[in-house]
Amino acid sequence: MNFNTILEEILIKRSQQKKKTSLLNYKERLCVLPKSVLSYYEGRAEKKYRKGVIDISKIKCVEIVKNDDGVIPCQNKFPFQVVHDANTLYIFAPSPQSRDRWVKKLKEEIKNNNNIMIKYHPKFWADGSYQCCRQTEKLAPGCEKYNLFESSIRKTLPPAPEIKKRRPPPPIPPEEENTEEIVVAMYDFQATEAHDLRLERGQEYIILEKNDLHWWRARDKYGSEGYIPSNYVTGKKSNNLDQYEWYCRNTNRSKAEQLLRTEDKEGGFMVRDSSQPGLYTVSLYTKFGGEGSSGFRHYHIKETATSPKKYYLAEKHAFGSIPEIIEYHKHNAAGLVTRLRYPVSTKGKNAPTTAGFSYDKWEINPSELTFMRELGSGLFGVVRLGKWRAQYKVAIKAIREGAMCEEDFIEEAKVMMKLTHPKLVQLYGVCTQQKPIYIVTEFMERGCLLNFLRQRQGHFSRDMLLSMCQDVCEGMEYLERNSFIHRDLAARNCLVNEAGVVKVSDFGMARYVLDDQYTSSSGAKFPVKWCPPEVFNYSRFSSKSDVWSFGVLMWEIFTEGRMPFEKNTNYEVVTMVTRGHRLHRPKLATKYLYEVMLRCWQERPEGRPSLEDLLRTIDELVECEETFGR
């Protein structure tokens, strides 16, 4: 075994059947787990040929497969699954001890991944469906809650030591296991419950436990301990940019320009992620452009080909780290239009939402809610602006009696609360102990995207519209990655906050509607104009039906809020779409943008791109005008 290898063993893998025509077979493979990948080889250790490799960062779930004494057609009878990208690898171990060892080690390796599934399928995919829930789509959302940290591994007794042999001494534990994890707070956080810990921006904290993806136990410099939101802190490492005020992680070119323009300060700047993974861009504002007018410049941070590599904005001034570049150009323009004078950031201004108001808190006491003005009404009832504990602004949906399948929703709400992303409207909790039930969510100041577009027609640039598409696609890609289907994506179900960020709302809620006019494809309220053929014909929802709806949403955005097929009835739309008719190209959309929409409207689901592919395409379009930097 190689020194860097964690595990190495001959196991049996089942073919992943990535294509419908692929045969189902079971093959013996040498499985090797180093630090960054899971590889499997044909042959033995002496002479082996790699047949496959899975990047550890792409793994979303590792778990034992529940088989209920079903027939396993190979000699190894102890299965576990590795879910990665859009595939599931089933592996069969020769003993329960072997299986437990692999599952435990793999879980340890993926514990810091940001794509861990919320629900998974505990049983095999076989004969065209999952044996646990009988869903027939391979990408169907999981049916059982998945908690990476609640291990299902059985504790097995160690083998009895041989009497005549002396037991070897235990291995010396590696030093790094005892090192403390120190993080830095990026935002202030006020403790709302006794078990919470207050965060002060810029202060350091020691992490004690990570038993929940969204809430970690920590200790401050005074010795106080409690739970903190994990998205409010970042690791204290010299190469971690999150700790710097000038770094804005989730900011595209259009939003960067908007922030810089709002600050309106000479030399205002920020560092943000480039559309090319692993690269960064410096966005810079000057009031005195080349011809005396204000303007923006976007400079790519380049890397040298030397070892160790260096970074630079101006080739003559290369440094060993990005913070060193920024520090240098704060004092020297050196080829830039102006010095980096004033860092512009969202840190400290707009703290991200948290998964609930506190750790393990999803039931909200209605006496803690203050009701204010009405915001609107929808399928489920009236929505009002309110406050929680007279401090935090929230939106409160009062569920009209008979409008929702309440028992099913309450159970699902616990899972939905753990869906947290900057481009999703956060569910904070529910009030279920009285009637009507209340759903408490993040408040979005500018209301629904559809009205936002219609009220400001003629005032949007193409960049601004594309940025809206990017926001929605980021939220939808997160749902896809977590095997969660929206089912009713449209401009009316997206909201806009004060900063102009668009977030996806009401994801998954369509499942709980009891109104036949909305749930039946023949009903007058059924959203036919946003649905692909497999939905209005067979009610087959999947992430690929969400892709179709996303294409229609793009059309809504680039028509500034027009109704799709506005002159046609639902019945006429079904006939037209079935015959291959598609929405026309909006005037504000380029030919290439319209081609992206048409890809979303392919008749067969497998012909449509994934939301991950769409996001990559849109990211490239957003950044395509960045031509500065030499």
Swiss-Prot record:
It is found in: Cytoplasm; Cell membrane; Cytoplasm, Cytoskeleton. Residues 246-344 form the SH2 domain. Its cofactor is Zn(2+). Residues 369-622 form the Protein kinase domain. CDD domains: PH_Btk (cd01238), PTKc_Tec_Rlk (cd05114), SH2_Tec_Itk (cd10396), SH3_Tec (cd11905). GO terms for biological process: adaptive immune response; intracellular signal transduction. Zn(2+) binds at H121, C132, C133, C143. It comes from the Eukaryota. Preferentially expressed in liver. Expression is also seen in the hematopoietic cells such as bone marrow, thymus and spleen. Lower expression is seen in the heart, kidney and ovary. ATP binds at L375, G376, S377, G378, L379, F380, G381, V382, V383, K397. It is a peripheral membrane protein. Non-receptor tyrosine kinase that contributes to signaling from many receptors and participates as a signal transducer in multiple downstream pathways, including regulation of the actin cytoskeleton. Plays a redundant role to ITK in regulation of the adaptive immune response. Regulates the development, function and differentiation of conventional T-cells and nonconventional NKT-cells. Required for TCR-dependent IL2 gene induction. Phosphorylates DOK1, one CD28-specific substrate, and contributes to CD28-signaling. Part of a complex composed of EEIG1, TNFRSF11A/RANK, PLCG2, GAB2, TEC and BTK; complex formation increases in the presence of TNFSF11/RANKL. Interacts with INPP5D/SHIP1 and INPPL1/SHIP2. Interacts with CD28, FASLG, FGF2, GRB10 and KIT. Interacts with VAV1 and JAK2. Interacts with LYN. The PH domain mediates the binding to inositol polyphosphate and phosphoinositides, leading to its targeting to the plasma membrane. It is extended in the BTK kinase family by a region designated the TH (Tec homology) domain, which consists of about 80 residues preceding the SH3 domain. The SH3 domain is essential for its targeting to activated CD28 costimulatory molecule. This is Tyrosine-protein kinase Tec. It comes from Mus musculus.
